Amino acid sequence: MKPSERICAALDFPTFAAAEPFARAVAPEVGLLKVGLELFAAEGPAAVRGAARLGRPVFLDLKLHDIPNTVEGAARSAAASGAALLTVHAAGGAEMVRAAVRGAGPGVRVLAVTVLTSLDAAALDAVGLAGPPEAAVVRLARLAVVAGAGGIVCSPHEVAAVRAAVGPGPLLVVPGVRPAGAAKGDQARVATPAEAVRAGADVIVVGRPLRDAPDPAAAARAIAAGL
């Protein structure tokens, strides 16, 4: 995999009209484009189709978490929109993950989100998940892979432990990456792009450091050069 192919640019914008100039600029420099909740809530499948027209696979990051039947239907609809990857919460349980895989079909890779990168140990303890984040992440990753997930989403702090737990097959997608010196924002468990890849990440998700850069394409090239 070329370094640029490891970068997923997050289209964190309120509308596709706002996202499109950025997406067109970075698409030649990255491997994937991510449509998240904000953009999908505003425009639905049209946002996925618009991003796909730019020639890169689309990562639809909805983090589905509902009863299995509902998630299966949502995954089927996501596949019909043209998404290549789709996220669900591993905490929804093994049957929910299996339902998502059935609904998505063979053309869409279902990724299971373990623990959000905005949560630290204190935040996890407050919601009843006592102990280090790594333990929860590894437990959820194993559950999801056994249930058929094609990949795992985890922070750069846990990616090495997840790789050791699930083996070489699943795609490991890592948000919460920030170039050296960049602001952390609302992320609690972060690392640089190079650190994440060295730890075992296949794909890194980059949002604000690209979106807020004066020249997003140049920023993407700089990240790729450091991988």
UniProtKB/Swiss-Prot annotation:
EC number of the protein: 4.1.1.23
Cell cycle listed as a keyword: no
Coiled-coil residue spans: none
Pathway membership, UniProt: Pyrimidine metabolism; UMP biosynthesis via de novo pathway; UMP from orotate: step 2/2
Membrane-spanning residues: none
Domain of life: Bacteria
GO molecular function: orotidine-5'-phosphate decarboxylase activity
Entry-linked CDD domains: OMP_decarboxylase_like
Annotated GO biological process: 'de novo' pyrimidine nucleobase biosynthetic process; 'de novo' UMP biosynthetic process
Active site: K63
Record's keyword terms, sorted: Decarboxylase, Lyase, Pyrimidine biosynthesis
SUPFAM superfamilies per UniProt: Ribulose-phoshate binding barrel (SSF51366)
A Pfam family it matches: OMPdecase
Residues noted as binding substrate in the record, renumbered to the chain: 12, 34, 61-70, 117, 178, 187, 207-208
Entry GO CC: cytosol
Catalytic activity: orotidine 5'-phosphate + H(+) = UMP + CO2
Summary of the function given for this chain in its UniProt record: Catalyzes the decarboxylation of orotidine 5'-monophosphate (OMP) to uridine 5'-monophosphate (UMP).
Subunit-level organization: Homodimer.
Family, as annotated: Belongs to the OMP decarboxylase family. Type 1 subfamily.
Entry protein name: Orotidine 5'-phosphate decarboxylase
